[in-house]
Every structure is written in structure tokens, then in C-alpha cells.
């Protein structure tokens, strides 16, 4: 039986994820923590406690109880934080990182002290930055294990798989559509060629890729720019954590996509840190399933690499105290087919 802690459980994503985690028999204790005064995590826990499953619920409100929430946890989910409406590009992701970095750093330092053996799953946006912040904070603390730190990329893989299956009529439960490289709008690379019967015309692949990359922005606009897709994000995040628990408790379990430090960068297109399908076992990440790419996907990956490196470097700099500089190869933080209103002025200034 496992002890699972959810940091940020009072947020929209945290509440949805906690609802699904409460239903898992493998969890002995589900510890819900939040330090935001407006997030009534005790009320969330009391509500979930009415669900007649075997998992026990504990609630911790306030920073003074972070130690108790994390003590001897087997899995820690760091979620929640601020979101920019609508999500757009790396320029806004950098701003968002400054809002959320303290939440992630404080949680990571506490994990290093009170549950250094735990697997950390980072969902707080932007995941690319916060994964690096978490990993390098643990390195500074001397307890880093690359097998036990991952960035949650489940929402992007789930969206890509749903799009693919809605067109082909395939069963989503029997099909996987990997999303590699990173987790952000400018860094996610859906690999439709790896899915079964994925022989689409290039124009359709372009459209599907754009839908995956702009999914956050689309759903935000549908909701009148008031919120993101918390239900789908919470569900996919919970599914990722459940698969981690199955790997710990039952044996090797497949996860459709997670941002991790690769075992051999040479086998992952020269990228030491990359989101790929992985296998999780009793000691954490045990295997990396790097998909083969077609020419379009290879070009998209090359275009996305410097964006991912920039985001990872931003997180690293604030973990170790280095000064951050924008990646020298970056000209516009947006994806290639449509620069956004945020970045267009910056691009014009550079051309002068």
C-alpha cells in the first residue's frame, strides 16, 4: 500500500486528480496539501472522504504542515499554480514560471528533506521549466535520482490520441499516440506516424499537429478566456500518477509520455532531457520507448529543440543561481506557422 501526496490539491486540477486518486485501492493514504488561503483543501478532503473507497484522506492547509503532508510519501504530485489566460507561447511561459517557481521550489526542497525516496511528478505549468527547477534543486540537495523525477505530459498524449482515434475510429484504449520533445505549446511534437494506421495526408497531419499544439488556447477561448481544461488535465494527470503507482506496486507499467532525463541521449535524437513514452517499475523509470519519426516530425523536432533547451535552462538557472540568458538561436518563441500577437512586435523590432 502506498502513501501519495498531492501538493496543490485545492486547485482545480488538484481537486480533479484527487477525485480519481481516491478511487485507487493501492493507495493507503492520500495526503492533500495546499498553502493558498483561498483553496480550502480541508473542505476538498472532507468532500472526498464521503466516497466509500478504502483510501484514507488527510488534509493539510498552510506551509507549517508541508512536512506532515510529505513525510514518507511514495509518490508526490506537484500541481496547481497560476495559469495565464489564454496560454500562448514561450514568452508568456517565462512570465508564468516566475509566478509558479516558488511553489515548485518550496515543495521540492521539502520533498528532498522529508521524502527523498519518493517519485516526483511535476504538473505545475510551465512543466518544461518546473521539471528542470525540480531536478536541479534535488541535485543541489544531493538527493537527485533521474529515475524518480518526471514532468507530466499525459494531457498532450491523451489529446493527440483522442484526435487520432476520432478520425480513424480506433479504440483509444488500444492505441497510443506519442508526444515527444516537451510539454509546452512550442515544444510538443505529436508523432502520428507511430499510431496504428496513421497514414494521413500531410495537410491533415499539419492540421492535427496544430490542434495538439494549440489545444490549451482553443479550450480557453471556448470557455470565454476564464479557465483552462481543468477536467481533462486533472484526469490525465491522475492517470499518469496511477500508472506510476502500478509500476511501484505491481511491476513495469507503460506511461504514454513524460518529460524525463534520458538514459542514452544518443538514442533520443541527441536530447539528454526529452518527453517520450516510458516504463515505470519499482525503482522509478526503467525504460524509454523513443518512437521513430518521419521527415516532417524530424523537422518539427529540430525546430522545437531550442525552445525546450531554453525552458530547461530557465528552470536550471533559478535552481542553481546562475544568470539566465535567452537561447541564442531563438528568433520568435511561437510555432512556425503563426506568430502570436505577443511575439510579433518583438520580431519586428529585431528586423529593424
What kind of feature is each model-predicted range?
Residues 3-4, 30, 120:
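Conserved hydrophobic helix-helix packing surfaces used for dimerization/oligomerization
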Residues 10:
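Conserved glycine-rich cofactor-binding loop
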Residues 14-15:
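N-terminal Rossmann-fold NAD(P) dinucleotide-binding loop
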Residues 18-19, 108:
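Generic hydrophobic/aromatic pocket-lining and core-packing "Φ" positions
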Residues 26-73:
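Conserved N-terminal Rossmann-fold NAD(P) cofactor-binding segment
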Residues 55-97:
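NAD(P)H-binding glycine-rich loop region in Rossmannoid oxidoreductase-like domains
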Residues 91-162:
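Rossmann-like NAD(P)(H) cofactor-binding subdomain of soluble oxidoreductases
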Residues 140-148, 153-345, 352:
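C-terminal substrate-binding/catalytic lobe of Rossmann-fold NAD(P)-dependent dehydrogenases
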Amino acid at each position: 500500500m502506498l502513501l501519495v501526496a498531492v501538493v496543490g490539491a485545492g486547485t482545480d486540477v488538484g481537486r480533479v486528480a484527487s477525485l480519481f486518486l481516491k478511487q485507487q485501492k493501492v493507495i493507503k493514504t492520500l495526503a492533500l496539501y495546499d498553502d493558498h488561503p483561498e483553496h480550502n483543501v480541508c473542505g476538498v478532503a472532507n468532500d472526498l472522504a464521503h466516497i466509500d473507497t478504502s483510501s484514507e484522506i488527510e488534509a493539510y492547509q498552510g506551509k507549517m504542515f508541508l512536512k506532515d503532508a510529505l513525510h514518507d510519501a511514495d509518490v508526490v504530485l506537484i500541481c496547481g499554480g497560476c495559469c495565464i489566460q489564454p496560454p500562448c507561447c514561450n514568452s508568456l511561459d517565462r512570465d508564468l514560471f516566475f509566478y509558479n517557481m516558488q511553489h515548485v521550489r518550496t515543495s521540492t526542497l521539502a520533498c528532498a528533506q522529508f521524502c527523498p525516496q519518493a517519485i516526483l511528478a511535476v504538473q505545475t505549468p510551465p512543466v518544461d521549466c518546473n521539471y528542470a527547477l525540480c531536478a536541479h534543486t534535488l541535485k543541489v540537495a544531493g538527493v537527485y535520482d533521474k529515475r524518480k523525477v518526471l514532468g507530466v505530459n499525459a494531457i498532450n498524449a491523451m489529446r493527440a490520441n483522442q484526435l487520432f482515434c476520432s478520425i480513424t475510429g480506433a479504440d483509444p484504449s488500444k492505441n497510443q499516440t506519442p508526444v515527444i520533445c516537451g510539454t509546452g505549446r512550442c515544444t510538443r511534437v505529436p508523432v502520428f506516424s507511430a499510431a496504428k494506421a496513421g497514414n494521413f495526408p500531410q495537410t491533415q497531419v499539419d492540421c492535427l499537429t496544430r490542434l495538439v499544439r494549440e489545444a490549451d488556447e482553443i479550450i480557453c477561448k471556448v470557455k470565454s478566456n476564464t479557465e483552462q481544461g481543468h477536467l481533462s488535465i486533472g484526469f490525465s494527470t491522475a492517470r499518469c500518477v496511477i500508472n506510476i503507482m502500478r509500476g511501484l506496486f505491481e511491476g513495469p507499467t507503460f506511461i504514454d509520455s513524460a518529460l524525463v532525463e534520458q538514459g542514452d541521449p544518443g538514442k533520443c535524437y541527441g536530447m539528454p532531457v526529452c518527453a517520450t513514452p516510458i516504463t515505470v517499475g519499482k525503482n522509478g523509470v526503467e525504460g524509454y520507448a523513443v518512437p521513430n519519426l518521419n521527415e516532417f516530425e524530424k523537422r518539427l523536432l529540430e525546430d522545437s529543440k531550442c525552445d525546450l533547451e531554453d525552458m530547461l535552462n530557465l528552470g536550471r538557472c533559478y535552481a542553481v543561481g546562475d544568470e539566465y540568458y535567452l537561447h541564442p538561436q531563438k528568433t520568435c518563441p511561437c510555432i512556425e506557422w503563426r506568430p502570436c500577437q505577443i511575439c510579433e512586435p518583438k520580431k519586428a523590432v529585431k528586423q529593424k
